[in-house]
Structures are given as C-alpha cells and as structure tokens.
Amino acid sequence: PFDMSVGANIVLSSIIACNASEKFGYAGLIIAPLICGTIIGLINGIVYIKLHISSLIVTCALSLIYEAFSVYATNGKNVILSADYRAFGDYPVNLILALIAYLLCAFILKYTKIGTYTYAIGSNEVVAKNMGVNVPKYKIVAFTLAGFFFGLQAILTISFGTSMTSASNLSSMSRNFTPLMGTFFGLAFKKYGHPVIAIVIGEMIIQLMFNGFVALGAPTTIQNVVTGVALLVIVALTTKPVKGLVVK
C-alpha cells in the first residue's frame, strides 16, 4: 500500500506543532506533531483496511480532510514558529534528530517482529498470510509507524522553514514526490544492502540533483519535468511485471 497523505500529514502536524509550542514550549513542539502524525497514520490504516479499496484512493481522499483541518487550525493564515523554538532547524540539532529517526527505523525493520512481518507482507502478501501473519493488523501498524515518522519530519519542517501555510485542493501533494522517489530508490537497490541506507542515499542523490538545478538557475518547469521522468524511471526499475496474466 502507498500513503499519499504524506504532505497533508506534515502540513497539519507542523501547524499543530507551532500552535502547541506557544503554550508548552519545546515539549509541545516535539510531542504534539508526533501524536498528530501517529493518529493520522492510524486513521489511514484503519480506513484502508475497513474499506478494502486502493490505498492511493483512500489516502488521497483523507488528504482533503486533513487539509481542511489545516485551514481550520490556522483560520487561513500563516503560522509562524517563535524564534525561541527553532533549534531543530539548525545544525547539528537537525542532523541529530534525523539520525535518531534513521536508527529507530533501521532497528524496527531489522530487529523487531514488526519489521520481519512488514518485509514478508511486502514480498508476498499471500504467502505471509498463509504463514499465519495477521496481514490487516500489520498493515495498520505500518501506516501508524509511517505517521509517527511524518510527525518527526514535521518538527524539522516547521523548525527549518519557521512558518507553515494551510493546504487545500490537494496542494500538499507537492510534498509527496521527493520522499517517494527516495523510497523507490531504496526499493530498487535494497538487495545490495539495508533498505533504509538505500533510501537515505537516494534522498541525498535527489537533493544534490535539485541543488544542482538551483545552482544552474534552471526554471521550475524543467525541474518538474526531470523529477517526473526520474520518478517514472525509478518506479519502472522497482516494478516486477507479472507474466501470463490475462486482462478481462
């Protein structure tokens, strides 16, 4: 399953973090987006499992709802993070938080039952189910954990950008493609090592590419074209065609 509510989750969690920091300081800045992101992930997983429809459709539809909440939370205005609570936007604090997220994700995938079952479901859902894995349960867990990490990203996003604008009409979707490209890159090269390492390398390559465009003064339209082509190529490399199927 795919989660296309990444952008909406980050936008709403960032807004919640900014508002919470005004009342609770750094405690609110850290705890509020983690709770918000986790709850959004849990909702995504439950709705996806209960409705039995494509995760793309479910998360796109839910993104509209989360964006509406972001408009309500800001009254249509920008929220600005106080200068007293921007430490996570500066080096080395931002790097430390990113490293913690990386180590936590790698640990979950490699050393826990959740990681083992996630790999099994991702490789072959039918086989995993026949082996006794509670597939619906662990899909919900995967969505929930993803939401937690989106909450972590929200902390970095609001701290670095210092402000956040509410989203509407799926405008938050623009935030989805960079992390998706890194994820597909990780899937393409996971056989050569740990997938989390591959994802980090993929994201670094993508950011270097974007920074190169900025340095060259390339227009945004060209950047979007290259991003789209790169996404298609990476997805093509990670997709396993099934032969012998007859479309009726």
Feature annotation, model-predicted:
Residues 8, 12, 27-35, 57, ...:
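Hydrophobic alpha-helical transmembrane segments
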Residues 123-137, 209-248:
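Cytosolic-side transmembrane-helix boundaries in multi-pass membrane proteins
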Residues 150, 165-225:
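Transmembrane alpha-helical segments in multi-pass inner-membrane proteins
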Residues 25-27, 31-33, 39-44, 91-165:
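Helix-loop-helix "hairpin" substructures at the membrane interface of multi-pass membrane proteins
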Residues 1-23, 48, 180-193, 197, ...:
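Single transmembrane alpha-helix segments in multi-pass membrane proteins
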Residues 24-63, 201-202:
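Alpha-helical transmembrane segments within multi-pass membrane transporters and channels
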Residues 19, 42-50, 72-73, 107, ...:
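Membrane-interface helix caps of multi-pass small-molecule transporters
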Residues 51, 55-112, 140-141, 161-172, ...:
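Transmembrane helix-bundle core of multi-pass membrane transporters
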